Amino acid sequence: MTPLALIMIIIAYLLGSISSAVLICRLRGLPDPRTSGSQNPGATNVFRLGGKGAAGLVLLCDILKGMLPVWGGYFLESNPLLLGIIAIAACLGHMYPLFFHFKGGKGVATALGALAPIGLDLTGLLFGTWVVIVLITGYSSLASMATALLAPLFTWLVKPQYTLPVAMLSCLIVLKHHENIRRFFAGKEKKIW
């Protein structure tokens, strides 16, 4: 691994470690999403705590945290494996942020941003899958997990060389949803609205 590759991975992790949910809630005078609502610093919890505007800002910032470092890797002509590692680093930063005591979100929006540079067709498939499942079931967590599980298949159909890193990222997202899975099967998982 080259020094530049290592620097790109570190930058991706540090960028991912900026918790937009916590910062936006502070700026808007909302409760800390790590200790309120579902206690997850992500767009869905911020939606419940502060409405569409705050959640939209969190969603945008979280997508950009994943997108910018991967686009940087594309610009520097990194190979697919390195781009995957950069994407995973950004998501790990979001999930386990250095700046916020390693208590982060689930990484769904950051992963969407990290996968967006692969292509708009993949982004559309992922976003469309999430929306359809939310509209049918009302569960953001179920939509996120189902979309994560389908992401490697969609990637294989669009650009197969990225399938392995996307599969690794998908595993991280599903594992991060372990509490949601438990609540869902216990009948205690909350719907998005």
Swiss-Prot record:
The enzyme's E.C. designation: 2.3.1.275
UniProt keyword terms in alphabetical order: Cell inner membrane, Cell membrane, Lipid biosynthesis, Lipid metabolism, Membrane, Phospholipid biosynthesis, Phospholipid metabolism, Transferase, Transmembrane, Transmembrane helix
GO molecular function: acyl-phosphate glycerol-3-phosphate acyltransferase activity
Highest taxon above the source species: Bacteria
UniProt record similarity statement: Belongs to the PlsY family.
Subunit structure as annotated in this protein's UniProt entry: Probably interacts with PlsX.
Protein name from the UniProt record: Glycerol-3-phosphate acyltransferase
Organism: Aliivibrio salmonicida (strain LFI1238) (Vibrio salmonicida (strain LFI1238))
Gene name tied to this protein: plsY
